Amino acid sequence: MNAITQWEHYSIMINKEPINKLLKNLKDSGNYRVFNDILRERGEFPRAIWYGPYNIKNITNWCSNDYLGMGQHKVVIDAMHTALDQTGSGSGGTRNIGGTSHYHVALEHEISTLHNKAKSLLFTSAYVANEWTLISLKRIFPNIVFLSDSKNHASLIQGIRHSKAEKQVWHHNDMDQLEELCANAVLANQVPCIVFESVYSMDGDISPMEEICNIADKYNAITYIDEVHAVGLYGEHGGGWTEKLGLQNRIDIINGTLGKAFGVQGGYIAADADVIDAIRSVASGFIFTTSMSPVACAGAMAAIKYLKDHNEVRDQHQAQAKKLKERLTANNIQVMECATTHI
């Protein structure tokens, strides 16, 4: 039996009825996802080439999250070329067994400095960072209760769910309800952990971060913030809204991405040294996987360093976002009132 015949044999053994039912339901409800086959060309951002089923055409990519075009910036590409020539393509292992290159160490130091934290920890994506940090917090604090904003990202929701910890969901940005939940947790001898985002991806509004920190201080709660739509874009050095508001030292754990504004790939958390040490010791999603490519680390580090010193890039991005919203409004296309950011 050759390889193709063997594969067909095993495929026949699968009961396709549940699969076909799922796919039909997704298509009938309009929730079936279709990939856009595009090719971004360096130097032409945000233009791209779209490969359709019947034709190929030039497009303007309005849905990219490469907010600042750093994915095509010369300083990033040059850094990646240098690393590729020096180290080759991959890391060669997990972080604990040969997969910690000097590029990983240097990038984690750069991230720690960006967020004014003692340590940081790289993950293969910000989704994985969220998921496995939250799972790890449950292992470290058995009596933890997660207090989650109702508009949190799927990675936060899944991380809490997979941790099997108790959770309470508070209405979006509702500080009265959050304080009530914190008080109840303390009365129940639990460790409250407030999980929220700085910039919410679906409607572009921001959280009342200072008020959340005040509540956390009052009830000795852990604070966990997702800054993936803010790092690189806000703050004097691109440290996100926590830097912009001077709250970096009041947030226990900051999650960020090396995609989006930094234009590369990967995710991280930044926190106290002991917190990072504990999480790296128990997070299976960190331990048992090949680490990021040193090439990606080099590109991300170059992007972070560049954006630390180039506020004009952030200013231009904000000006363009403001102009777009004004033109949409002028043409009777509704912009959500709560969308006070670039989203």
Language model segments and positions:
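Active-site phosphate-binding strand-loop segment of PLP-dependent enzymes
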Residues: 66, 168, 172-225
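Substrate-binding/gating loop at the entrance of the active-site cleft, primarily
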Residues: 125, 147-163
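Amphipathic alpha-helix from the class-I
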Residues: 295-315, 326-330
